[in-house]
Amino acid sequence: MIKWPWKVQESAHQTALPWQEALSIPLLTCLTEQEQSKLVTLAERFLQQKRLLPLQGFELDSLRSCRIALLFCLPVLELGLEWLDGFHEVLIYPAPFVVDDEWEDDIGLVHNQRIVQSGQSWQQGPIVLNWLDIQDSFDASGFNLIIHEVAHKLDTRNGDRASGVPFIPLREVAGWEYDLHAAMNNIQEEIELVGENAASIDAYAASDPAECFAVLSEYFFSAPELFAPRFPSLWQRFCQFYQQDPLQRLHHANDTDSFSTTNVH
């Protein structure tokens, strides 16, 4: 019998958070009961430590807060919540938002442009998200805005900027970089062959190593059946870093469902 941490005494039911309902999204149904219980414990601590700030009239209720916290904690389920140190606020727009972007080109000219963003992650600042794309992160499609931005935070723990190489033993860095760049090249080749819209992996992964790590982290957790067979060596490195194997988890869940179905009388 699993003792769920959110199941409280009868007198406290009014203040209990809806963790069981929050866990019902497709992305989290493959987790075992033990993993779900551990994830909820982390998410409870996350909500105690971080401030969720709704912007532009967005309404944040307890169910939305719980689901946001669960998705933040999924990548650090085995790493620990301390891996999410370094920020204290999560800003949430109702929809993708416009920002002023500034960059310097190869000859030193500075350009300014207003662009639409789904999310942002600053090394020593808040994470910025939007609810429309958070909702689209609930399924197992390969897209997950929260995991993408969390991956950037994990990436920057290794240095001053996101490099695509998280905090791993130094002896593993060269192999990680080799496999990551090989994946980027493979994704770029597919894009050139079939176009961005028809590519099986989000084309953004080919833009630079940091984005490749973030995008493939999305696929690692929400579409492992696409990631693992295509980049098996890099997949093993991700499993070792995150200390999770979502593909094995998916197969186990499917096997359990099949067994339950065949034993229904």
From Swiss-Prot:
MF GO annotations: aminopeptidase activity; metallopeptidase activity; zinc ion binding
EC code: 3.4.11.-
Listed Gene3D superfamilies: Collagenase (Catalytic Domain), Glucose-regulated metallo-peptidase M90, N-terminal domain
Subcellular location: Cytoplasm
Note on cofactor: Binds 1 zinc ion per subunit.
SUPFAM superfamilies in the record: Metalloproteases ('zincins'), catalytic domain
Annotated Gene Ontology cellular component terms: cytosol
Keywords: Aminopeptidase, Cytoplasm, Hydrolase, Metal-binding, Metalloprotease, Protease, Zinc
Principal place of residence: cytoplasm
Family listed: Belongs to the MtfA family.
Gene Ontology biological process: proteolysis
Summary of subunit composition and partner proteins: Interacts with Mlc.
UniProt protein name: Mlc titration factor A
Top-level taxonomic group: Bacteria
Gene: mtfA
Entries under PANTHER family matching the protein: MTFA PEPTIDASE, PROTEIN MTFA
Matching InterPro entries: MetalloPept_cat_dom_sf, MtfA_enterob, MtfA_fam, MtfA_N
Free-text function comment from the UniProt entry: Involved in the modulation of the activity of the glucose-phosphotransferase system (glucose-PTS). Interacts with the transcriptional repressor Mlc, preventing its interaction with DNA and leading to the modulation of expression of genes regulated by Mlc, including ptsG, which encodes the PTS system glucose-specific EIICB component.
Cofactor: Zn(2+)
The keyword Zinc belongs to this UniProt entry's keyword annotation: yes
Binding site for Zn(2+): H111, H148, H152, E211
The keyword Hydrolase appears for this protein: yes
